[in-house]
Amino acid sequence: RGAVCIEIIDSKENEPSGIWLKNGCFDFKVTDCSERIFDTFSYEGKGFYADSFRGPFLGVKNDVYRPLFEKFKLIESGPIFAVIEGSGKFVNTKLSGEGIKFTIRLFVTAGKPWIDVSFRLFNCTDDTIEPRELTFYVEAPGDGNGNSESAKASDIRTLYGISNYRTKFEEGSKGAEVGGVITAEYLEKEANEHFAEVFYGTFMADVTDRKQNVGVCATIYKAQQNFPKAISTSGTGIKISLIPDQVETNKISKALPVRFESGMAREQRFLLHFHDGACTDYDLNNRSIIYQMPDTPYVDPEVFERAQVMPDIFLPSEKQNDDVEISLIDKADGHARCYGMLCFGDAPDPGYTAQGRGNGDLVWTNNEYDYPHAMYMMYARTGIRRMLDYGNTAVSHWMDVDICHYSANPLYVNGQWEHTRRHNGGTEDGTFSRGIMACSHEWVEGLLDYYHFTGDERALDAAIGIGDNVLGLLDTPEYQGLGEISARETGWALRSLTALYVETHDEKWKTRQDWIVEQFAKWKEKYGSWLAAYTDNTTIRVGFMISVAIGSLMRYYRVCPSDRLKELIIWAVDDLTENCVTPHGLFYYKELPSLSRNGNNTLLLESMAIGYELTGDRKYLEYGIKTFKKAINSVAPGAVGGKRITEDTLIVGSGAPKAFAQSFLPLAFYYTKAAKEDLI
C-alpha cells in the first residue's frame, strides 16, 4: 500500500467531543456519550458503516444491558500505530454500587486493514454478577441502512474455522449459518501439545459479499484458553460471543458458569480483519494464526546484563552448567495450565486446597511470590520466547482478576488479593469480596516488567495502585508493633516500595521505606533477632520469612547504601547460619519442635548469596550448597497430565506457579555467585 501514516484529528470547538482516525484503510470517528462504538465508519468506501457494529450487549438473567460509551481518549498516537480507549458503563438503574463498567480499546496500524479490539468488563457492584452472555455483532456488508446490497443470497459466503494443529473450515453457501462453541468438555477431549500461553489454535468466522467485493473476518484471541467462547456467521453478519449464552452452555457442560465477583475485571480481545472478496481461506487463516501467535523479537541476554535492569542472574556460557540450566527450564515449564476466562494465567495451589483453606473450593495462588517477575527474569537470561508469554499471560490475569477494582472498603481498592477461593474470596452475601489483603502478598515487580516489555501503561497504574494499598495497610495498627507480625510482611512491603521508588522517584515511597528499615533495626534491638509470634506463647525464627526481609533490605541497600544497613543485613544472614542450619547442611523449615523438619525453601539461598556479595566470604555460599543441589535435582511438577474439569476451569497438570515464582531468583542469584567460585 506504499507509505501510509495514521492521521488523528481531535474534535473542534462546538462539536461533540470525539476522535477521528484515518490509517489508509479506515476512516472512522468515535464520539463521547454515544450508544455505539463508531459515530462514523468507512472501509475503503464500501460495505461497512457505523451501524455495522453493534454492542457489546451484556445479558444478566432476563435483562439485556446496552452500552454507553462515555469518554474516548488517545492512549497512543503515532504515525505507525495508535490506540484509542473508550470508557463507559452498561445502562441499568437496578444495579448496586457503581454498576458494571467497561473499557474498550481499538488498536490500529497504518496501512493495515484490521482492528484489534480489547474489551474489559468491571464488576463495580456489591454483588456477584453471573452474565448470561456478552456479545458483539458485525453486520454483513450493506448499504448503511441495515440492508444488504447483494441481490442474491448466493453472493454471500460464510466461513467458520477452528484449529488445533490444522484449521478445520466449514463453509456456508448462500449465507447459511456456520459456527461453533468452545466448552470445557470440548477441550477435555481434544489433544493439544502446545504451550498454551504461547498458542493453542485459532477460532474465526468470516462473512464475504462477493458482489461488493468486501468481507470481514473475526478472530477471538486465545478463545480455547479463555473458554467458554462462541462465534458464528450467517448472511446477516458475525456474532462474537465473548461469553456465549450460559443457560444453553450449561445444558452441555458441567463446568460452572463464568461469574464476576465484586471488584473483579476481565479483558478479552478479538480481531476484525477487513478484506476484498478474493481473499483466500489461507490468507484469512494466516492472519488469524499470526494474531494468536505473532512474531516477537528479543534482546540478547548479554544486552540485559550490560543494561543492569535485572538482578545478577547472568553467566557467560563457559560458566554455565548444563544440568542447572536444564533444571531451571524444566521448573519454568512445570506449572499447571488452567483454562477458563477467569482462570487462565493462574493456577490453584494443591497444598493450600488440600489443607482446606478454600472451604472445599480450589485455592488460587493469585501470582504468589510474583510469578511474572520470575518469568521475565528467566526470559531475559535465556531468550526463550515462551517465558515471555508465561509472564504476559499471568500479568493479564493479575491486573484483572487478582486486583480489587471496586469496594466500599478503601483498604481493598487497588490492592492485590491473597491466595484464596474464587480468586478474591467470593461475594455470595452481597457484601463485597471476602478475601484478605496483606503486605506479604502484594507484589509490583512483575507488573513493572510487563510495563517495560509492552508499554502498557495500565500495568504501571496497577503497580502504583498496589503500592498505595501497601501504604494504607502499613498505617493500620497491625503493623505498628515490633515483632507482632512476620518478617515477610514488612519485608515484601519494602521490596514493592523500593521497586516503585526506582521506577517513579516519588519520595512518598522512600519515606515509608526508611520507616520499615528503622522498624527492622528496632526489632533486632528489642529481641536480639527477628523473632515473630507463632503460637500464643512462643516467638520463633522462620528462616524463609527472614530471608524475604533480607532480600528486600538488600534491594533498598543497592539504591540507598549505608554502613549501618550493610551491618544489619550481614547480622541477619549470620543469625540464619547460626540458628537455622540442620546438622546435615540444610535449613530448618521453622524454628519450633513441631515444625523443625528439613526445609526445602530456596529463599534462604538468596540470603546466602547476599552474605557473599557483601563480604566476599565464600562460607556463605557453602552453607547453601546442599539446599541448592537438592532443589536443582528435584523433579519439577507435571505441566502435562490428566485433564479435569473443576469449578469453572479445566486443569491440565498439577504444578502450582508459586513454586517457580519463589525459587527462581534465589536459585539463579546463588548459582551465578557459586559458579564464579567454582562451587558448581
For the regions a language model picked out, list residue spans one by one.
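Solvent-exposed loop and edge beta-strand segments that line ligand/cofactor-binding
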Residues: 253-255, 259, 355-368, 423-440, ...
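Low-complexity, Ser/Thr/Pro/Gly-enriched N-terminal "stalk/linker" regions
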Residues: 288-361, 403-427, 664-680
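Helix-terminus loop motifs that line ligand-binding clefts
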Residues: 386-436, 458-469, 492
